[in-house]
C-alpha cells in the first residue's frame, strides 16, 4: 500500500528548534552565495598579492571556474550522501569544509593554492543549498514548505546582491582581502553550533541506504567538464567557448553517457526510480533549466549592454544589475508565501509570464534607455529600473514553488539528491543559456553591423576633425545600433523561453501529486528519523 508524504508520519523537532535549524541553514546558504560573488570586487587586490599583472586578468579566471567546478560537480553526490547520513551531519561537514577552504584561500600566496582553496569552498558550498532545501522539506509539512523554501532561495539570491558590496566593506574594514575569507570561519562555526543544538541525533536504520559513489563520480566528472568547457570568461569576445572548450564538452558527453549506462545496470543508483513520479519531476528540472538560462543571460548581457550601448565602465555597468538582483529575493520570499496558498503550478506559470513580460520590455530598450520612461498616465516610471525589476521579480517567484513541486514527487528518502538535481539543472541552464545565446548574438551582431554600415552614408571630406574622425563616428553609430538590435533579439528570445517555461510549469506536480512510498520507507528516511528533543 502506498502512502503520501504526510507530516504526521515524520517525527520532527519542536517548532522553535526547527526555526533555529533552518535559520542556521539559511546562514550557511548565504555564506556560500556571498563567496560566489565576492571575488568580483576584490579581484584586483588578489591579483596584486599573487603576482599577476593588471593586464593579465584572464589568469585569475580559474578562481571563478574553480569555485563553479566544485559547486556543481560535488552537488549531486553530496546531496545523495545527506539522504544516507542525515542532513545534520552533511551540513556540518560542508560548513567545516567551507571553513577549511576559506583558510586555504586566505593563506594562499600563489594562484595554484588560491584555486585549490576555492575548489574546496565551492564543493562545500554546493552541498549547503540542496541539503538545506531538503532539510526544509523534512521539517515542514508539504503544504507549508514552499514558504520556507522561498526563504532559503531568498538567502541564495541575496548573496548575489550583497556579495560584491560585502567584499568591499570587509576590505575597507580590515584593509586586506584575506579578511573576506577569514570572516567565514567564525560565521561557519556559529552555523555549525546552531545546527548541532537545534537538530537531534539521527537514529540509525537497520538497513541503511547505500550511496552510488561510482555513479556520483561519473556525474561529477561530466558536470565538471561541462562547467569548465562552457564557461567563457569573455563572452563578448571573438569565440563563444574558450579555446579548450570543445574537447572538454566532448569529454563531458562521454562521461554523461557512461553515467547513464552505469545507472541502467547498477544495483545501487544515484536516484532510485522506485516511487518517483518522473514526468512531473523531469518537467520541474526542465523549467529549472529554463530559469537558469534566463537568469544568466540577464547577468551577462545587461552588463554588456551597459558597456557597449550606454558607454559605462565595468563597475557602472555591473551596478545596473542591482535592480534585477534586488527583485530576485523579494520575489523568492513572496513566491513561497503565495504558493502555500494557491499552489505551485499557478505561481510558477505566473512568475515566468511576469518574467517574460519583463524581458519583452527589455528587448525594446533604445540606445538612450537611461532617459526613457514608461508613461502610465497617473505615474511615470524609469524604463530600465522598471523592466529589470519586473524580470527579476518574476524569476524570483518561481524559485520556491519549483523546488517544492520537485520534492513532492520524490520519496522523502531521496530529497537530498532531488534538491541537488533542481539546483544543478538551474546551473547547467545558466551555462548552456549564455553559451548558446552568445553564439547567436555574436552571429547576429556581425550581420547587424554590416547592415547599419551599409545604411549610413560615408563621412564627408569636410567632416569636423577630418574624414578619419567622421569614419570613426560612423563606425561608432553603427556599432551602437547593432548592439541595440543584437541584445534586443537576445532578450526577445529569452522572453520566449520564459513563456515556454510557463507552459511547462502548468504540468509540474499539483497539490495532490505525491511520490509513492511505503510506510516503512517514510519512517526509514534518514533525515526524518531525527528524534524530537526531550525538553
UniProtKB/Swiss-Prot annotation:
Outcome reported for the amino acid change (mutating residue 468 to D/K) = Partially complements for vancomycin resistance in M.smegmatis
Keyword Ribonucleoprotein present in the record's keywords: the answer is no
Annotated region (Beta-hairpin) at 373-382
Molecular function per GO = lipid binding; transmembrane transporter activity
Specify the effect of residue 299 to D: Still complements for vancomycin resistance in M.smegmatis
UniProt site positions, description: Forms salt bridge with Arg-426, probably closes bottom of cavity: 157
Q: Which UniProt keywords apply?
A: Cell inner membrane, Cell membrane, Lipid transport, Lipid-binding, Membrane, Transmembrane, Transmembrane helix, Transport
**Any one annotated GO CC term:** plasma membrane
> What is known to happen upon mutating residue 150 to D?
No longer complements for vancomycin resistance in M.smegmatis, in TM5
**Topological type in the membrane:** Multi-pass membrane protein
The positions annotated as site (Forms salt bridge with Gln-157, probably closes bottom of cavity) read 426
> What's the main place this protein lives?
membrane
- Annotated site (Protonation/deprotonation site), which positions? 35
Picking any one GO biological process from the record gives: lipid transport
Q: What induces it?
A: Part of the lprG-MHAS_02167/C731_2107 operon.
- Show the PANTHER family listed in the entry: MAJOR FACILITATOR SUPERFAMILY (PTHR23501), VACUOLAR BASIC AMINO ACID TRANSPORTER 4 (PTHR23501:SF191)
What does this protein do, in the record's words?
In association with lipoprotein LprG transports triacylglycerides (TAG) across the inner cell membrane, probably transfering them to lipoprotein LprG in the periplasm. TAG probably regulates lipid metabolism and growth regulation and plays a structural role in the outer membrane. Mutagenesis and molecular modeling suggests TAG (and maybe other lipids) enters the central cavity of the P55 transporter from within the cell inner membrane via clefts on the cytoplasmic face of P55 between TM5-TM8 and TM2-TM11. From there the lipid is probably transferred to the hydrophobic cavity of LprG.
What does UniProt say about this protein's domains? Has a canonical major facilitator superfamily fold with two N- and C-terminal domains of 6 transmembrane helices (TM1-6 and TM7-12) and two transmembrane helices between the domains (TMA and TMB) that form a hairpin. In the open out conformation (PDB:8PNL) has a large, periplasm-facing cavity constricted on its cytoplasmic side by a salt bridge. Between TM9-TM10 is a periplasmic beta-hairpin that extends along the membrane plane, helices TM11 and TM12 extend 20 Angstroms into the periplasm. Asp-35 is a possible protonation/deprotonation site.
Q: What is this protein called?
A: Triacylglyceride transporter MHAS_02168/C731_2106
The species is Mycolicibacterium hassiacum (strain DSM 44199 / CIP 105218 / JCM 12690 / 3849)
The upper taxonomy is: Bacteria, Bacillati, Actinomycetota, Actinomycetes, Mycobacteriales
Amino acid at each position: 500500500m502506498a502512502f503520501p508524504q504526510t507530516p504526521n508520519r515524520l517525527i520532527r523537532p519542536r517548532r522553535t528548534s526547527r526555526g533555529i535549524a533552518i535559520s542556521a541553514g539559511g546562514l550557511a546558504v548565504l555564506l556560500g552565495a556571498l563567496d560566489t560573488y565576492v571575488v568580483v570586487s576584490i579581484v584586483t587586490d588578489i591579483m596584486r598579492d599573487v603576482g599577476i599583472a593588471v593586464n593579465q586578468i584572464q589568469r585569475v579566471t580559474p578562481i571563478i571556474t574553480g569555485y563553479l567546478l566544485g559547486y556543481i560537480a560535488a552537488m549531486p553526490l553530496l546531496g545523495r550522501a545527506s539522504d544516507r547520513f542525515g542532513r545534520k551531519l552533511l551540513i556540518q561537514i560542508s560548513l567545516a569544509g567551507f571553513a577549511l577552504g576559506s583558510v586555504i584561500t586566505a593563506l594562499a600566496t600563489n594562484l595554484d593554492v588560491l584555486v585549490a582553496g576555492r575548489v574546496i569552498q565551492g564543493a562545500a558550498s554546493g552541498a549547503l543549498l540542496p541539503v538545506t532545501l531538503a532539510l526544509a522539506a523534512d521539517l515542514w509539512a508539504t503544504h507549508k514548505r514552499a514558504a520556507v523554501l522561498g526563504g532559503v532561495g531568498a538567502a541564495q539570491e541575496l548573496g548575489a546582491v550583497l556579495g560584491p558590496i560585502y567584499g568591499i566593506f570587509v576590505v575597507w574594514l580590515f584593509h586586506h582581502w584575506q579578511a573576506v575569507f577569514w570572516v567565514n570561519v567564525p560565521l561557519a562555526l556559529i552555523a555549525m553550533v546552531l545546527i548541532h543544538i537545534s537538530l537531534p541525533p539521527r537514529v540509525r536504520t537497520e538497513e541503511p541506504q547505500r550511496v552510488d559513489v561510482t555513479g556520483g563520480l561519473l556525474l561529477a566528472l561530466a558536470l565538471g567538464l561541462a562547467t569548465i568547457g562552457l564557461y567563457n570568461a569573455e563572452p563578448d569576445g571573438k569565440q563563444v567557448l574558450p579555446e579548450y572548450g570543445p574537447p572538454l564538452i566532448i569529454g563531458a558527453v562521454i562521461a554523461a553517457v557512461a553515467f547513464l549506462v552505469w545507472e541502467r545496470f547498477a544495483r545501487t543508483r544515484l536516484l532510485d526510480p522506485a516511487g518517483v513520479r518522473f514526468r512531473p519531476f523531469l518537467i520541474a528540472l526542465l523549467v529549472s533549466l529554463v530559469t537558469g538560462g534566463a537568469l544568466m543571460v540577464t547577468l551577462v548581457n545587461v552588463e554588456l549592454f551597459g558597456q557597449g550601448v550606454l558607454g559605462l565602465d565595468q563597475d557602472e555597468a555591473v551596478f545596473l544589475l542591482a535592480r534585477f538582483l534586488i527583485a530576485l529575493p523579494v520575489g523568492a520570499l513572496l513566491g513561497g508565501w503565495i504558493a502555500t496558498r494557491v499552489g505551485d503550478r499557478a505561481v510558477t506559470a505566473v512568475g515566468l509570464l511576469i518574467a517574460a513580460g519583463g524581458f519583452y520590455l527589455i528587448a525594446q530598450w533604445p540606445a538612450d534607455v537611461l532617459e526613457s520612461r514608461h508613461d502610465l498616465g497617473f505615474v511615470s516610471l524609469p524604463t530600465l529600473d522598471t523592466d529589470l525589476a519586473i524580470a527579476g521579480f518574476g524569476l524570483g517567484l518561481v524559485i520556491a514553488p519549483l523546488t517544492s513541486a520537485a520534492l513532492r514527487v520524490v520519496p522523502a528518502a531521496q530529497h537530498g539528491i532531488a534538491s541537488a538535481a533542481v539546483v544543478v539543472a538551474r546551473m547547467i541552464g545558466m551555462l548552456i543559456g549564455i553559451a548558446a545565446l552568445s553564439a547567436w548574438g555574436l552571429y547576429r551582431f556581425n550581420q547587424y553591423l554590416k547592415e547599419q554600415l551599409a545604411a549610413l552614408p560615408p563621412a564627408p571630406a569636410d567632416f569636423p576633425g577630418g574624414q578619419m574622425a567622421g569614419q570613426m563616428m560612423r563606425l561608432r553609430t553603427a556599432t551602437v545600433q547593432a548592439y541595440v538590435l543584437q541584445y534586443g533579439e537576445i532578450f526577445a528570445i529569452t522572453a520566449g523561453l520564459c513563456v515556454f517555461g510557463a507552459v511547462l510549469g502548468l504540468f509540474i506536480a499539483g497539490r495532490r501529486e505525491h511520490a509513492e512510498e511505503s510506510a516503512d520507507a517514510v519512517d526509514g528516511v534518514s533525515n526524518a528519523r531525527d528524534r524530537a528533543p526531550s525538553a
